[in-house]
A protein has these predicted regions:
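Alpha-helical transmembrane segments and their juxtamembrane interfaces
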Residues: 10-13, 80
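Bacterial N-terminal signal peptides that target proteins for export
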Residues: 1-9
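Exported/periplasmic ABC-transporter solute-binding proteins
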Residues: 19-67, 74-77, 81-100, 105-250
């Protein structure tokens, strides 16, 4: 009888521990910073956190299709709006966490020098190569970059050269490997990859603000998920975001 009771008790503990796990769907560009943040949160709270990284558009559609995400961290407000409009966010949990900057990058050993300005010779600088950029129709970094290049008057010249990568990290890899001469990524991505160098930054006025909102998914609000979204907007997390090059959303 004691063994049966003990087995039931241990099974209950295991089930509780499993139930306490938190699954986060997060924009690919958050990887290093969020990895450190969830590690810190887990150490303090005892909660285990799993993170799935991908393009925000892909994650939003997975949530729409019933994927078991507890939190969603998007690289733009539009895809968070997409989820919210389908009543898939827990009310009162959405908040803007961090902001980012767009940069033009080249392989670290490139001799190319190029400054961003109206009508700057981006297409000519590619010399027949391709511009590493995530899909501008769906992926946040691609949409921001399209807006910036349109503002600068060079979008029509480079549109056909795009790699249309699935996310910003895929674009970063192409540049780091020297498979493309240039790419557009977030400043935080460039900081995380020593095999690329930043040629110049895009002025924030050229595109919509690069804001990363976070929220708990509908039906997933509990003390653990509330604690995590609160932590990610709190002072300890802010210090980690800043360490990796993000700005704090106001």
């Amino acid at each position: 009888m004691f063994r049966i009771t003990l087995a039931i008790w241990l099974s209950s503990i295991a089930a509780t521990a499993c139930a306490a796990d938190i699954t986060v769907f997060a924009a690919a560009s958050l990887k290093e910073s969020l990895d450190e943040n969830v590690k810190t949160f887990a150490a303090k709270s005892g909660r285990q956190v799993r993170v799935s990284y991908a393009a925000s558009n892909a994650l939003a559609r997975q949530i729409e299709n019933g994927a078991p995400a507890d939190l969603f961290l998007s690289a733009d407000e539009a895809w968070m709006d997409y989820v919210a409009q389908r009543n898939l966010l827990a009310q009162g949990t959405r908040r803007n966490l961090v902001v980012n900057t767009l940069v033009l990058v080249a392989p670290a050993d490139s001799t190319l020098s190029l400054r961003i300005a109206p009508n700057f010779p981006l297409a000519a600088a590619l010399k027949g190569g391709r511009l590493a950029l995530a899909n501008p129709d769906t992926v946040p970094i691609g949409k921001y970059a399209k807006a910036a290049l349109t503002s600068l008057g060079v979008w029509s010249e480079v549109e056909k050269t795009l790699t249309r990568s699935e996310n910003v990290r895929a674009s970063l890899v192409l540049v780091a490997r020297g498979e493309t001469p240039l790419g557009i990524v977030y400043a935080t991505d460039a900081k995380a990859e020593h095999k690329v160098k930043v040629l110049d930054s895009f002025a924030a006025s050229l595109h919509p603000p690069v804001v990363y909102p976070g929220a708990v998914v509908a039906g997933r609000l509990n003390p653990a998920t509330q604690a995590l979204i609160d932590y990610l907007g709190g002072p300890e997390a802010r210090a980690i975001w800043i360490k990796y090059g993000f700005g704090i959303a106001r």
